[in-house]
């Protein structure tokens, strides 16, 4: 296979992966934003109506913002690269470095948000006996199930972003190996023939 064909296939693969990450992040975001449940609990002789939604916890709000940020970033990169003929801003080293760093940073942000939301989901499901906080999934079962699906899709997006990070790192550092090959070729041409 020709080297240009490999580069083109890798660029198309990266674009498809970025599109998939955009869709998965949007799915996770929509599941979490639409996830709410109202429950009526008996407290003594009265009943109390309570509502649980993503805005009840700052960790879940963080996950919503992180998913939105990653989806927007991936969409913008796909959009700009589609106008650049499929190359994902790799024309120069500064663009490749920007993508490499942003991919890494956003993958870490989404991983930390999904991890924080996982801890919240664990506390909602299991409770915390030391603080006398009971499990809320008995009352808010639908909310808990939707929260788990949203967190799972966020971790799928993290895996996709990790794959994108590997691809962007490979493409960035291949520019340096290409440069090193050119320098070595120039050095070989400049050596005197008497050494041969």
Swiss-Prot record:
Family matches, as InterPro entries: CASP/CASPL, CASP_dom
Membrane topology, from the record: Multi-pass membrane protein
Cytoplasmic topological domain residue ranges: 1-11, 80-95, 170-196
One Pfam family cited in the UniProt record for this chain: CASP_dom
TM annotation in the entry: 12-32, 59-79, 96-116, 149-169
Any GO CC annotation of this UniProt entry: plasma membrane
Residues of the signal peptide: none
Record topology, Extracellular segments: 33-58, 117-148
Disulfide bonds: none
UniProt keyword terms in alphabetical order: Cell membrane, Membrane, Transmembrane, Transmembrane helix
Compartment(s): Cell membrane
Self-association and partners: Homodimer and heterodimers.
Entry's family note: Belongs to the Casparian strip membrane proteins (CASP) family.
Name of the protein this chain belongs to: CASP-like protein 2U1
